[in-house]
């Protein structure tokens, strides 16, 4: 009987925490992550434009590849009122060294002109209460 109560309480607490993480929309604050050279930087155009942010796990960088390539090649995530960019979730990619992931992103952005930033310590996912982003391709819209 005690085990059933404990299991039910554990399930309830997990459900409640997951539900809290999914409550939208909510106010978020700008965070400081790293540029591809490893220097601290804030998210661009904060409060100036609507932002389309791709929060990507480098272990699973091919998720939604067709969608991402379409946006990059046709600059569909850029305009007078919107700016799109990527943030690599490096903490959840332990098999990919941070420097290697940043160098791969540098090569890709040199070709397509996109902006990619690096989050080495889940700063963005913690600050914005995104929950578990491991192996996920998270697309976020942040309004100005």
Regions found by a protein language model. Give the residues of each.
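Structural microenvironment flanking redox-active thiols in thiol-disulfide oxidoreductases
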Residues: 61-109
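N-terminal "domain-start" segment that seeds a small globular fold
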Residues: 21-41, 62, 66-67
């Amino acid at each position: 009987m005690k085990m059933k109560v404990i299991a039910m309480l554990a399930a309830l607490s997990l459900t409640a925490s997951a539900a809290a993480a999914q409550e939208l929309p909510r106010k978020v604050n700008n965070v400081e992550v790293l540029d591809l050279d490893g220097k601290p930087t804030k998210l661009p155009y904060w409060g100036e434009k609507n932002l389309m942010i791709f929060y990507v796990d480098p272990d699973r960088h091919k998720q939604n590849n067709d969608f991402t390539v379409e946006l990059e090649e046709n600059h569909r995530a850029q305009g007078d009122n919107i700016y799109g960019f990527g943030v690599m979730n490096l903490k959840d990619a332990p098999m990919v060294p941070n420097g290697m992931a940043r160098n791969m992103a540098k090569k890709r952005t040199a070709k397509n002109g996109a902006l990619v930033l690096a989050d080495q310590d889940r700063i963005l996912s913690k600050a914005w209460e995104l929950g578990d982003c491991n192996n996920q391709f998270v697309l976020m819209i942040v309004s100005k």
